Regions:
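Alpha-helical transmembrane segments and their immediate juxtamembrane cytosolic regions
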Residues: 1-312
Length: 312
């Protein structure tokens, strides 16, 4: 018998997707020049993608259902491929760009495909997802920063950086994570953690550290040549900060909320299509002379999405 879904997970996804959308409006809009906007963008970035990746791992289907498992992987890849190809046509991507550089927001779908395939292989090799594996993944993520060619190409750096969160979600599938957090973490401590994180975000914004924080918590580039060890330390620190802030967010804000629950159930669609919202507000350029192609792109991708299980 399939276990009853805890709707608080949908509330969490709804909260996260709204944070992601708001952050993208800040980052890609002109308001990012203001201290307040930078502060919010930095603060939100600390927990949104780590929690999204964790939730994706937490709800990853069991490999024992091989046909259904691969159908889910192909569904995610199909959605990724449709967007990548059509956006490539709209913006005149070269073949190399089309293959090697995921379009804005699409890197996550490519990462999901890779992580799910890796999990399938680990399962077939009888390798358990446990604390040792998570530690190894963190060490690998720290190490790849020293490799100059592992960066935004194929989103490899991000795939390595966020992998520990995905497999941590898989490892904790049999634990009622939300209940455990609410039981063990006291509300005053959770508020203190978030206040300290917010103060640090303000300081980073005031002292022009926005892009340093942004880069560290995205993990999308190799370490700067002259400061490799410093940035490795920052990357390790980012894992600790994201973990602590994330559980605090869950403790304080993940409760019953019908509106967020509704949004959370369609989080993948919001994630993929909010690019059109950015275009509508003039934050991202609209290829007007390819408008009809854009409409076909939107309709076809939506048709694909409606046929697939949600990846989030």
């Amino acid at each position: 018998m399939e276990k009853i879904r805890d709707t608080r997970w949908d509330v969490l996804k709804g909260l996260l997707i709204l944070c992601v959308l708001y952050r993208h409006f800040l980052v890609y809009g002109s308001s990012i020049s203001y201290i307040a906007s930078k502060t919010v963008a930095n603060f939100v970035h600390v927990f949104t993608m780590p929690l999204f990746v964790f939730v994706s791992g937490y709800f990853t289907k069991h490999v024992d259902e091989t046909k259904r498992y691969w159908f889910g992987i192909l569904g995610v890849f199909e959605t990724y491929a449709v967007y990548q190809i059509f956006k490539g046509l709209l913006y005149h991507y070269s073949i190399w760009q089309l293959i090697s550089f995921p379009a804005l927001m699409m890197w996550y779908l490519l990462a999901l495909v890779i992580w799910k395939i890796v999990y399938f292989c680990l399962n077939k090799m009888k390798i358990k997802v446990n604390g040792i594996l998570i530690t190894l993944l963190v060490l690998i993520a720290l190490a790849v920063g020293f490799v100059p060619f592992i960066g935004e190409t194929f989103a490899l750096s991000r795939i390595f950086y966020f992998a520990p969160y995905f497999f941590l979600g898989i490892m904790l599938q049999n634990i009622k994570v939300i209940d455990e957090i609410k039981l063990r973490l006291k509300v005053p401590l959770a508020w203190l953690i978030l206040i300290v994180a917010l103060i640090c975000s303000i300081m980073a914004s005031v002292y022009n550290g926005f892009y340093i924080v942004d880069g560290v918590f995205q993990g999308n580039e190799p370490y700067p040549e002259e400061e490799k060890w410093i940035y490795m330390g920052l990357r390790f620190f980012s894992y600790l900060v994201s973990f602590i802030v994330s559980i605090s967010v869950v403790r304080l804000f993940v409760n019953t909320n019908r509106t967020l629950e509704i949004v959370g159930k369609d989080s993948l669609k919001f994630y993929i299509f909010h690019g059109f919202g950015l275009m509508a507000f003039g934050i991202l350029p609209i290829p007007w002379k390819y408008g009809l192609a854009g409409l076909r792109h939107n309709s076809f991708a939506n048709h694909i999405l409606l046929q697939q299980d949600q990846a989030f």
